[in-house]
Amino acid sequence: MVKRVMLCMAVALMGMTANAQTNSNHLMFGVGALYEKGLEATIAYEHGSKYHNAWEYFATGYLQYDDDPNAGHVTKKSFWHNYNSWHLGIAYKPCVNRGRNHHGNVRIGASGGSDLHDFVGGVHLGYEHTYALKGGWELFFQVKEDVIIGSGLRWRTGGSVGLKLPL
């Protein structure tokens, strides 16, 4: 009798641990650098589905700085007031690499926003690798390629790093 109870408990525990990261939701914060002379910050909501696939709903702010022509170097004005844009978008992230305490996803998405003068749209393609930390927190690294439609800046490439907080 005791053996049967122990066997039932072991089977139940194995079933619970197998579903530990299915349908998990995260709040994501990330910062990154993009070529040429660009910085970005992103806040996102990620809804995980089966097998580490996920949907991401994001808001991104982008800043491109430049040298001040009068000073010959980057100044406060040339840093903050050269080119700014923001985007709201969605990305699907199918899992392509899975291992112990980490997984990798291709990131495919689209966004729309403004460069403070006109509407701009974006198509996003990249790779995100995520490492599981204690307490459900996750650390992620992204390599991204963005094609921007409707602005003078057409192509962005770079990387970002951030944290995913469990909800």
Question: What do these predicted regions represent?
Answer:
Residues R154-L167:
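Outer-membrane beta-barrel "beta-signal"
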Residues L27-V31, I43, W55-A59, L88-I90, ...:
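Membrane-embedded beta-strand positions of outer-membrane beta-barrel proteins
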Residues N23-N25, K37-A41, N82-L88, H102, ...:
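Residues that define the transmembrane beta-barrel architecture of outer-membrane proteins
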Residues A33, H47, Y92-V96, H129-Y131, ...:
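Residue-level signature of outer-membrane beta-barrel architecture
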Residues T22-S24, W55-N84, G104-V106, G112-L116:
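Flexible, solvent-exposed loop segments that connect beta-strands
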Residues A20-S24, K50-A54, V96-G104, H117, ...:
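Short loop/turn motifs that connect adjacent beta-strands in outer-membrane beta-barrel proteins
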Residues A20-Y65, P69, K164-P166:
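Short glycine/proline- and aromatic-enriched beta-strand/turn motifs that initiate or cap beta-hairpins
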Residues M1-S24, L167:
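Cleavable N-terminal export/targeting peptides
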